[in-house]
């Protein structure tokens, strides 16, 4: 692992020109955040040549020759005072278009999820490719795109209806799909007061039960009975044997044509809630693994923490590259339980990841002894 240093060539590339030598930056990418973001700043001690207005320009954020984000500069700010100047640039990846703009009224019934995504992204030539990362490309049932919905909301709604999720790759490719849990861990991160392998600067462990429920009832109205809006003829119930508190919840699913479609959306929601139940946030020095690989969402990481008894592989949901005068270069890693997010994209690979042995690898099991296996697998079967 590289130590805190300024030993990285970090640039913002605009129109073939690279802007370098930044004093501070923050480059954040996360599957669960609709649009990734960047923020750069540099100061100077005196006057210099005027810099053109770059706001609205397409750019690439590049580290050591590798593109880590393609986006749009949303804001450019110049600060001036006696004897000093400061320039700052901030923006988001190309998902910003989809987050800000309203979706067209579009009938997607019968389209595949990939074709629907291509249709929604078509007005933006900056998004040069739309791809599927899943075993199947399912056809869609009737899905209502409500007036006022953004393109990203509509796209997420469509993807979630078949157990998938949208995101942008560093090169600007729009992806609909899920995690491939077959890739080997890119690094082992260790926290120990006695082990000289310790390579973690800071570690936060969070358990959260706010979205864990003892029983969840999912309801939907099949389209064949749409004339009776007061009744829901589709029902599926999930009981969590590990939740000892009485916490019942009812969820109404708007777009489900049959019980199988209802169950798929229900399982996606339950998986998302489970993800919220456990988060590891780790800060390391530098931006690369010991093997020289830049940290990137979608990687898998082996984490050992002797104090909390953690020894397991986790999924890297998000990462944040940072530079500051005080701390040098650092990377914040946001890790989640392996095999939980988008389990329907590659079902066998996700199941293998969930069954892999490990100590304290996710949410705590609050139920009686013996209920562990059922709790870990029931949501995904």
Where are these regions (language model features)?
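Structural motif
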Residues: 14, 63-64, 198
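Sec/Tat-exported extracytoplasmic proteins
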Residues: 124, 159-162, 166, 222, ...
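An acidic/polar, Gly/Ser/Thr-rich interaction patch typically located in mid-to-C-terminal regions
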Residues: 20, 24-52, 197-381
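Short beta-strand and beta-hairpin "edge-sheet" elements
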Residues: 62-91, 168, 301-331
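N-terminal alpha-helical "arm" segments
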Residues: 1-18, 23
């Amino acid at each position: 692992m590289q130590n805190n240093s300024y030993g990285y060539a970090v640039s913002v590339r605009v129109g073939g020109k690279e802007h370098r030598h930044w004093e501070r930056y923050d480059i954040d990418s996360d599957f669960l955040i609709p649009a990734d973001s960047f923020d750069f700043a540099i100061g100077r001690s005196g006057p210099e040549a005027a810099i053109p207005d770059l706001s609205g320009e397409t750019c690439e954020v590049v580290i050591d020759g590798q593109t880590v984000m393609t986006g749009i500069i949303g804001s450019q700010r110049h600060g001036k005072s006696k004897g000093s100047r400061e320039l700052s640039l901030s923006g988001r990846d190309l998902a910003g278009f989809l987050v800000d703009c309203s979706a067209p009224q579009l009938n997607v019934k019968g389209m595949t999820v990939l074709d629907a995504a291509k249709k929604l992204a078509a007005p933006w030539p900056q998004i040069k490719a739309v791809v599927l990362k899943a075993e199947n490309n399912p056809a869609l049932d009737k899905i209502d795109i409500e007036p006022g919905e953004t393109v990203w909301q509509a796209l997420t709604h469509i993807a979630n209806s078949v157990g998938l999720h949208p995101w942008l790759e560093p090169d600007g490719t729009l992806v609909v799909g899920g995690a491939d849990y077959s890739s080997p861990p890119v690094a082992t991160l260790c926290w120990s007061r006695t082990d000289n392998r310790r390579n973690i600067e800071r570690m936060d462990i969070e358990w959260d039960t706010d979205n864990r429920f003892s029983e969840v009832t999912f309801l939907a109205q099949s389209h064949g009975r749409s004339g009776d809006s007061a009744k829901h003829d589709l029902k599926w119930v999930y009981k969590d044997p590990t939740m000892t508190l009485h916490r019942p919840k009812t969820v109404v699913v708007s777009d489900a044509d049959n019980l199988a479609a209802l169950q798929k959306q229900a399982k996606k929601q339950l998986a998302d809630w489970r993800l919220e139940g456990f988060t590891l946030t780790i800060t390391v020095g530098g931006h690369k693994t010991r093997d020289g690989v830049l940290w990137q969402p979608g990687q898998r990481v082996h984490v050992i923490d002797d104090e909390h008894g953690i020894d397991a592989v986790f999924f890297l949901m998000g990462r944040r590259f940072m530079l500051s005068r005080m701390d040098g270069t650092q990377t914040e890693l946001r890790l989640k339980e392996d095999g939980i997010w988008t389990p329907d994209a590659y079902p066998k690979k996700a199941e293998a990841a969930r069954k892999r042995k490990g100590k304290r690898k996710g949410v705590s099991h609050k139920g009686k002894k013996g209920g562990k296996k059922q709790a870990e697998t029931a949501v995904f079967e």
